[in-house]
Amino acid sequence: MHTEKAEGKTVFKLFPAVKKALACILPALLLLSCGCKGTDGSGICTESEKAVSASLKIYCDSYYRSAIERAARSFNSVYPDINIGFAENESVADILIADRMSDESAKNLAALDGFVNTDNFIKELLFLYNGKVIGLPLFLETDGIWLDKLPYLRENADVPCRLDQAVSSDFVKESPMLCGNNESLYWGIIAPLYLSCGGAADDIGSGSLSEAPFRQAAERLGKMAESGILKKNDKPTDAFVSGNTAGILCSYLDIIKIQQDMPLSSKLVFSPGIAAHENESINLIIRADTLFVSEKAEKEAARLFVGELFGDKSILRLISDTHLPSAVKVNCKNHSLPEIFREFYSVLSSTAVKTVYVTDRRNDS
């Protein structure tokens, strides 16, 4: 990574970032059993809505392909004349769900103010451009240190909660925490340190960091590296699954994939405070995988699709199917949630954690 100075700012640039899987998960919408909400308020589709004829192309990663196919089949059972397909690249997509959108690319996106009621969203994560909502947050996304308690129990070692504890832990020094990519390093360590050093959240979202807090954050990151508790590794997942590391720095989406290969006796815990000293606020940065609609998309077809996607029943089904925390406010009390999901929310609701919501507007460079 390197920095460039521009107008009193230090522009933080990563090595060419490997784009995270563009999160695009559309669940089965249960339209046959529940009906759909028509614009006439009757709870059923009007004949004019059913008669809409159009095509919608969605750009997504293969990780979400099967979920989108299920959603398309369910949606088409009610709207047979709206064909949903897949785009080969972002430039030809009508609908895109991504974790990043630069202001330059935002010029080509449609305003979504009238698509759904935005009161149920975390307002800080609504993606605004020129005063209009162009992006609707779907899933919460965060990066941080994940620990498996099992290796600590085997070594009779204490599980660290703060940087001071990690530095003084013989187990962490012998089996350091590993980081595999620059994106997780930026969001999980550098950005929280930048906030602790007096930097602004808006700077983090744009990637344009003020020099003084950035320099302090870089010095603290350097000390973490010198202490040996955090190391870069080409295959951090392999070491974490085998129990040969004290923890792994990765995104929530990545830990869900990793969990599938973990031993049954493993107990995963989320620890965003590893980069924070004692008596210092733990900054947990939350972003969102956000839905965008291209300006060239057929607006009525897109409105119908987006409206069904963000309905309460659909969001609850999304949570159940994907284990991803929702950026839409819904009541999950009567629904069974996976342990890793509860672990994330217990940290999110902790009074010891300062939650900072950020929209990622960085350029790809």
Regions from the PLM with identified roles:
Residues 2-4, 8, 12-14, 19-25, ...:
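Conserved N-terminal structural module of periplasmic/extracytoplasmic solute-binding proteins
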Residues 99-144, 155, 269-274:
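Hinge/lid segment of periplasmic solute-binding proteins
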Residues 101-107, 249-266:
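A ligand-binding cleft/hinge motif common to bilobed small-molecule-binding domains
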Residues 113-119, 197-216, 275-283:
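Short, solvent-exposed loop/beta-turn-alpha elements that line the ligand-binding surface or hinge
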Residues 204-234, 259:
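Glycine-centered hinge/linker elements that transmit conformational signals in sensory
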Residues 261-326:
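Extracytoplasmic/periplasmic substrate-recognition and gating elements
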Residues 319-365:
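Long, aromatic- and glycine/proline-rich binding clefts that accommodate carbohydrate-like moieties
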